[in-house]
Curated annotation (Swiss-Prot):
Subunit structure: Monomer, homodimer and higher order oligomers; formation of higher order structures is necessary for scramblase activity. Interacts with ARMC12 in a TBC1D21-dependent manner. Interacts with KLC3. Interacts with SPATA33. Interacts with PPP3CC in a SPATA33-dependent manner.
Full protein name: Non-selective voltage-gated ion channel VDAC2
Site (Involved in ceramide and phosphatidylcholine binding): residue numbering on this chain: 85
Modified residues (Phosphothreonine): 119
N6-acetyllysine modifications at: 32, 121, 278
Protein's job: Non-selective voltage-gated ion channel that mediates the transport of anions and cations through the mitochondrion outer membrane and plasma membrane. The channel adopts an open conformation at zero mV and a closed conformation at both positive and negative potentials. There are two populations of channels; the main that functions in a lower open-state conductance with lower ion selectivity, that switch, in a voltage-dependent manner, from the open to a low-conducting 'closed' state and the other that has a normal ion selectivity in the typical high conductance, 'open' state.
Organism: Rattus norvegicus (Rat)
Residue list for modification Phosphoserine: 252
Protein encoded by which gene: Vdac2
InterPro entries referenced in this protein's UniProt entry, alphabetically: Porin_dom_sf, Porin_Euk, Porin_Euk/Tom40
Residues that coordinate or bind ATP: 24, 32
Tissue: Highly expressed in heart, kidney, brain and ascitic tumor with very low levels in liver. Expressed in the head region of epididymal sperm.
Catalytic activity of the protein: chloride(in) = chloride(out); K(+)(in) = K(+)(out); a 1,2-diacyl-sn-glycero-3-phospho-L-serine(in) = a 1,2-diacyl-sn-glycero-3-phospho-L-serine(out); a 1,2-diacyl-sn-glycero-3-phosphocholine(in) = a 1,2-diacyl-sn-glycero-3-phosphocholine(out)
Length: 295
């Protein structure tokens, strides 16, 4: 008698995001596609040997200040290693070495150092991250002559529900300098995020994918001891595979609009504008232009 093989339906593995990425879908609708007051150029390319080069330059239209960064990255996939070199126009040099999934599955260790030749200032950081089903942990140590600072975070997820905690312990002061909580819920097209920072700042956001081409987001924040409540609504609509428009408005009557167009594969143009609705005739509005090149 032939054996009957019955396929086993495995439940998909759900790894929660790191604490910094909680509520990211809602924040992206507010932040991406806008660049008020800046003229920006980003260039990304990759050599035949696998070295990735990233260059970014921007000019602030208000102050006229020009800044730029250069980054090179090489991945040694066989050993799970990534080497990154960074430089910026403040003449700060950075080196980062990361190893992932080698010591154990889901563990990533990063060694990050920076050095400023002008001031002689040096800094070092060791980062660790561990992610498995239903859990995402992180612990970073900032080294300082006064004493290291320890940053820790943990996010737990179960059937769409997320709960996280983030802290910073300053060994020089021997006390917690940051203590944040977050609770959220997410599905394929809906995300809810709430957070409390240091017991004084309260925030929440909602992300909703209304349809395939239309995304919306709502953001609310309040600080205890003040009457200041911040509220905003944002939306993004994909006109076609190469173009999208974004818009947002907050309770301060600041209205932002953005238009992104892929001119050709690897070339993307973004135009944006910020209008102050309270003083429309007084000026002070901002424009932005960004060009991204990738090859």
């Amino acid at each position: 008698m032939a054996e009957c093989c019955v396929p086993v339906c495995q439940r998909p593995i759900c790894i929660p995001p790191p604490y910094a990425d909680l509520g990211k879908a809602a924040r992206d609708i507010f932040n991406k596609g806008f660049g008020f007051g800046l003229v920006k150029l980003d260039v990304k390319t990759k050599s035949c040997s696998g070295v990735e080069f990233s260059t970014s330059g921007s000019s602030n239209t208000d102050t006229g200040k020009v800044s730029g960064t250069l980054e090179t990255k090489y991945k040694w996939c066989e050993y799970g290693l990534t080497f990154t070199e960074k430089w910026n126009t403040d003449n700060t040099l950075g080196t980062e070495i990361a190893i992932e999934d080698q010591i154990c599955q889901g563990l990533k260790l990063t060694f990050d150092t920076t050095f400023s030749p002008n001031t002689g200032k040096k800094s070092g950081k060791i980062k660790s991250a561990y992610k498995r089903e239903c859990i995402n942990l992180g612990c970073d140590v900032d080294f300082d002559f006064a004493g290291p600072a320890i940053h820790g975070s943990a996010v737990f997820g179960y059937e769409g529900w997320l709960a996280g905690y983030q802290m910073t312990f300053d060994s020089a002061k021997s006390k917690l300098t940051r203590s944040n909580f977050a609770v959220g819920y997410r599905t394929g097209d809906f995300q809810l995020h709430t957070n409390v920072n240091n017991g004084t700042e309260f925030g929440g956001s909602i992300y909703q994918k209304v349809c395939e081409d239309f995304d919306t987001s709502v953001n609310l924040a309040w600080t205890s001891g003040t009457n200041c409540t911040r509220f905003g609504i944002a939306a993004k609509y994909q006109l076609d595979p190469t173009a999208s428009i974004s818009a947002k408005v907050n309770n301060s009557s600041l209205i932002g609009v953005g238009y992104t167009q892929t001119l050709r594969p690897g070339v993307k143009l973004t135009l944006s504008a910020l209008v102050d609705g309270k003083s429309f005739n007084a000026g002070g509005h901002k424009l932005g232009l960004a060009l991204e090149l990738e090859a």
